[in-house]
Amino acid sequence: CVPDFPDYHPEQPGGKPGGGRTLECPVFAFGELGDWRDRVTVSPYWPNYHIMVGETTLCQAVPEELPAEVTQHRIDNDERGLGQALIGRLLRGCLDRGIVPETDCRAVELLIEHNAVAGVVIDGPDGRFTVRAPNVILATGGFDWNSDFTNAFLRGPLDTSVAVPTNTGDGLKM
């Protein structure tokens, strides 16, 4: 957990007005992904993805930049933090298990049979198709770029985001 990072909904059961419920992964070395390394989308709006949320000056009472040698080591070794660290680990886990992710696709519907997820309907570059599977991982990101969702679920206006532009709430829509 990231101490002192604001809770999005502190008034909800389990909410913490002082923050501390935001989770993050340690940095992940993207070289472990082999040929998949460059297939992970990087936000054009946040160039320093080599840090973790707890290392940003937003989470510090007295802002202190990460030491230059630490940042340079992470850049040299392509060690990424923030959402990149989570995605890198999830992707590595899939690849280790022989699971090949569908990319450049949008999940549009979950197939539900007998009150359980039985697959997913996908819009891909070659059209719509269905994947039936006993397990489905929705790696759809957040909803930063969906103004209807940000207005409904976040406090105050969100005029811009540093997230990847594909964070449009597809998982929540389903």
Predicted regions located by residue number:
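Conserved redox-cofactor binding core of oxidoreductases
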Residues: C1-D126, S147
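Glycine-rich loop(s) and the adjacent beta-strand/alpha-helix scaffold that form part
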Residues: N77-Q84, G124-G127, V131-M174
